Amino acid sequence: MLPAALHPDSLWRPLEQLVLPPIIRDWMADPDSLTRRLKRYGHFSVVPGLHAIALPRADERRLLSLPVRRAALIREVTLHLDDTPVVAARSVLPLTSLAGANRSLGHMGSRSLGLELYNRPICQRDQVWARLASTDQHHSLCWGRQSRFIKRGAPLLVAEYFLPALWEKLHVARCVQASWLHDKAYLYASIRGEPTDAVRLSRF
């Protein structure tokens, strides 16, 4: 399952407005294929989860300019390194975006959607948005990013959550964990509607 947002008011915010630890920003702001990058660190695999025609969430609908009752293909997967889940991903593909040469995007199975997006013709990518999410009942935190892609003129939305196991794999887990107290301060300021530009997340 994808991480659940800690609070419905913990909204997506433009990535460039956030002060993040360098290692997290490096991954969140990387414009290239996440799949290709992950493959450098071990055996990569995609484990499919939800794959259904359903109504997008309100924030997803707004970013895709979809009518309120317009369904889309929702796909949720986890990306694994050496059989360990390191990224949870959710894609929202309007049915009108799955026509013609884009039809294969709706039948990815255990293949990486990211690799397909970066195959020719290479997709266009809009602004990157970010937010915090919880990963389990203990409220372990992770950062997620969301981007809108345009493939052959058709829009789709991809959200990726970087799970704690990724930082363990990169041997930087201790540094990332040290930043969570500051990250929580940012999140709770967001929930309360307080200014977040004064909440500086830790650096390392």
UniProtKB/Swiss-Prot annotation:
UniProt xrefs under SUPFAM superfamilies: Chorismate lyase-like (SSF64288)
GO CC, one annotated term: cytosol
Function statement: Removes the pyruvyl group from chorismate, with concomitant aromatization of the ring, to provide 4-hydroxybenzoate (4HB) for the ubiquinone pathway.
Chain positions recorded as substrate binding sites: 75, 113, 160
Domain of life, per lineage: Bacteria
Subcellular location: Cytoplasm
Pathway assignment: Cofactor biosynthesis; ubiquinone biosynthesis
InterPro entries in UniProt: Chorismate--pyruvate_lyase, Chorismate_lyase_/UTRA_dom_sf
Major site of localization recorded for this protein: cytoplasm
Catalytic reactions of this protein: chorismate = 4-hydroxybenzoate + pyruvate
Family: Belongs to the UbiC family.
The protein's Enzyme Commission number: 4.1.3.40
Enzyme class, first EC level, given as a word: lyase
Organism this protein belongs to: Alcanivorax borkumensis (strain ATCC 700651 / DSM 11573 / NCIMB 13689 / SK2)
A GO biological process held by the record: pyruvate biosynthetic process
Keywords: Cytoplasm, Lyase, Pyruvate, Ubiquinone biosynthesis
Protein's name according to its UniProt entry: Probable chorismate pyruvate-lyase
GO function term, MF aspect, one: chorismate lyase activity
Encoding gene (name): ubiC
Gene3D superfamilies reported in the protein's UniProt record: Chorismate lyase-like
